[in-house]
Amino acid sequence: MQVPYLQIVFLLTAVFGIGVKSDDCKTADLVVNVDGSDDVSDREFDKLKRAMLMLVRGLSIDDSQIRLGMVTYGSEIGDSIPLQGDRLDLARTIRYMKKPGGPCKPFKGIGETRKMFSSRGRFNVPHVTLNLGGDIVDSEVRDLMDETDKARDEDIKVMAIGLGTKVERDEIEGIAWDKEQAYFMDDADDLVRRVKEIPDYLCKIIKAKKPRKSASKKSKTKPAKKPDSDIVGKSPGFHSLQRTDDKPKMSKKVEVKELCDDAEWVEDVGYGSVPTRCEDFVMCQNVSGSLRKTLKTCPYGQFWSRARTSCVLTEDEDCSDDLCKTMLLPSRDYDVSCRAYWKCENGKSVARCCPSGMAYEPGKGCVLDSDCDEECPPKGDSDNGDDDDDDNDDDDNEYDDDDDEMEYNPNCPLRPIKGSPEKFKQHTGDDNWEEFDCAPGTLFSSRDCACSILGRPEKDDNGKNEDDTSKVCEPELYLPFCDDLHDYSGKETHVENEGDAVIIENGKAYFNGRAGLKIPRFSGVPYGKSVFIKMKYKEDEDDDKKRNDDDKKLRIKRDERGRKGYRKGGRKDDRNGKRRDDRIGKRRDDRIFDDRKGRRTDDRKGDRRDRIDDRNGRRTDDRKDNRRDDRKDNRRDDIKDNKRDDKKDNADEPMTLISNGECDNFELHDCFEKPSLAITTGKKFAGFSVSSTERDEVDLEVDNDKKGYLWNKDKKDKDDKNRRDKDKNGDRTDDKKSLDDLVKEIERRKSDDKKSFDDLVKEIERRKSDDKKSFDDLVKEIERRKSDDKISLDDLVKEIKRRKSDDKGNGRRKDDNKNDEDDDKKGWKTVSLKINNGHIRGRRDDREDKDIMDGDLKTTFSGFQIGQGASNKNFKGYMDEVYIYFCDPGKEADFDEEDDNGDDDDDDDDDDDKDNDAGDDNKDDNNNNGRKDDNNNDGRKDDNNKKDDKDRSDKNGGKDDKDKDTKDKFSDKDNGKDNEDADRDINDNDKLYRRAMKKCDFVNKNVEKWLDKR
């Protein structure tokens, strides 16, 4: 019979934390064996993976509690996950598991799980097998029973759950540990619904004491032979890969005698391989007529080669039991040192060491650990009993002795060379390491696994090269979006833009709300004690405008409906079904006839008859009808108001700016790898979420509506000053008045003789923040002329008007640049997250929030994602710059609103101001001469003023003609009315292009100097 539903074999070596109260059920090892044969459809396979993910989230997974593994099988073994205690890595790997296909052979899955228990199972920890599947094909029953009997003999408890209505109860009960450990469910959907019950099943089977043989069919395999009592040595990894000084006794031993039967004999010494342990071998010797067997382990980074009868480098031996052939994760632990681990490269295991001060943790990689001070590679690790191999091992470690004193990236095939940072070495095979030179001007970076550090090595007093670049905090990533997604940090970090969904143009990146950027380089990389991220962005305002228009239309419709309801409520029906206006009826003073009796009645009596139906005896008060109509209208209004509120709530949902977790829906609406870092943004807030290596989680929120956050001191002082002025002079809004408003104010006050010159100067000084250039010059001019009491308010008004025209005509380029900068800053926000030695600071613009956490930022294996992740909405808007540091760049990198190129512009402005001041001095001398003449002859005063005005107009006219070409290039106005829109579009594009070129030219020319300064 064929299997109607999916068949999974869960080898549960752990007990879940859901609903488990007993401490006896909290420690175990779990291997999940998944049926991926042709009997399983893709949809059913996804449901089974979903059930597995739900189990993973409910388990108390940890290296000290529950460890989980998984195997997929069809006709052969497919993807596998070794036993580990990292929940996020398990969920991430389960998601990418694929069906191997082929006929269903469940006994191969059981056999593979037995190997996993033998190689990675913990000693003295319950081992449980859960067989979950449908009806079993008759031809596979015997093999499956044989494997379950072997598992039972190895103290692996088997629990069986049958899926479907066609499963045979006897077969399921025969697989299980006993009949009480056999369960039945309708289908895969029923499994998803009842997945929370499985922890109780597991706890029950863990507490079961007496195993029994299969009830239906007994295995015909021969019982395992007991090993000889004189065996010397124990394999360090048949039940545990964790090597300790005090090794417990093993409950089961390898059949060494059988291994010696297959050994290769060389001069009365036999050498044999050990199943499932590529790095182990057995030595067999005849001693006094008896066979002495000794288990041995190859030196660090070597496997046993049966063909060569010796230990060789792992890359030179194709071991069929190498776990890298079946596992999905890139690395696993190596029990020779706390720093050692195996890395999978091209399907083979390669030994690696974590840098000093770090330890390897399964599923996490190299993590900071001050207690891990073991040597790696371990000295004297060889235990093969062969002197030649020992000699070769010394030669092999010629470079390793030097490398042990240096830190290097365990995931990098390149090694640094001590004292030569401009070089690196690479393993070329046959125990040879070849040196290579970095490109000129660069140094080798172990963390980047490339020559990515800008700089040159310096020599110390002894003549040795010393790498001082470690003292300079440089960004790991800098994206100004000038040359597409080119990284200007010098690290050449690759940034993925899938489908080119993120549009790069004019020095900005546009995110449409469905796109994002991915940076895989930071996957599995320890961030260290300091992390600094800074981003400049602007949300898309088109949605807000559309939303406001919709709200306006909704309010108009609701007002119209309210007016119609008012007219409807003011009209009533009479007994004949005709509608009349009560207001008209109330204004009339005439009499109304009753048609039935022909009598004249008063309006009040008619009103009473209108309220009572004599034929039916019921009240028909129109007020009730009106109330009913009002309730209907109110209900409609409430429904639309709720919809509008929902739209606003959706619009105010946080959008992800950057995260380092892998999150999407996948029918679970959750993250498969929870990010340890996420920055989100909303209309009025910015959110920061951080998780540490000590499982400490910190959430910060910078909200514009909340008090208690820090402000810039300058802005605070300015606000306090404006508030004092407002309290002193009353409620007014003239703080932002333009020059025209000031002229009108002076003209209005010029008749007031009580207004002194000093008061006017103070008034102008108070408002000079509105137009720094014009008002600064004006204040200087007034203070210089203040001693001359002969100047009148009329002259002052003319002077202001003249200055205003000069400002319009002079320096059109400066006005354009200023307008461009104002447009460029409009709506832009800057957000940063700084983590330094456990201190966290989240900041947006001039507000910030702080907190403290234990441990460093937790490393994830998803890399960084810009504009997406963390189970929030994708970012929709523009980004201008993105910085990522793994060090502390200092306060200079926090919020530098004006870049270095702004200094050059300021210098130019100062020169222009000096020229203007000089010109003003000459004009002032002329005016002073004119005023002296006015004292002698009042009649010539008007003529001189007219002449001065004419001269000024000529000068300004010539200046305007000179700047006419500049105005024509970027002017928004045109004499032709039909071409106004087209000119405006061209002008906008020119502004965007000029701003982009200004930024990108600066970045291209000064990025190296600029980064060194930081």
UniProtKB/Swiss-Prot annotation:
Annotated Basic residues bias: 212-224
Q: Which domain of life is it from?
A: Eukaryota
Annotated coiled-coil segments of the chain: none
Tissue-wise, where is it found?
A: Nacreous layer of shell (at protein level). Expressed primarily in the mantle with highest level in the mantle pallium and lower level in the mantle edge.
Q: What is its main location?
A: secreted
Q: Does the keyword Signal apply?
A: yes
Alphabetical list of InterPro entries matching this protein: Chitin-bd_dom (IPR002557), Chitin-bd_dom_sf (IPR036508), ECM_Assembly_Org (IPR050525), VWF_A (IPR002035), vWFA_dom_sf (IPR036465)
Residue ranges annotated for the Chitin-binding type-2 domain, each copy included: 257-374
Could you tell me which Gene3D superfamilies the record lists for this protein?
A: von Willebrand factor, type A domain (3.40.50.410)
In this chain, the stretch annotated as Disordered covers 212-250, 377-428, 539-659, 710-740, 802-875, 890-995
**A GO cellular-component term linked to this record:** extracellular region
Q: What does this protein do?
A: Essential component of the organic matrix for normal growth of the nacreous layer. The complex contributes to the initiation of aragonite crystallization as well as subsequent stacking of aragonite tablets in the nacreous layer. Pif80 binds to both aragonite and calcite crystals, with a higher specificity for aragonite crystals.
Extra facts: Pif80 and Pif97 are rich in Asp. This amino-acid appears to be common to biomineral-forming organisms.
Under which name does UniProt file this protein? Answer: Protein PIF
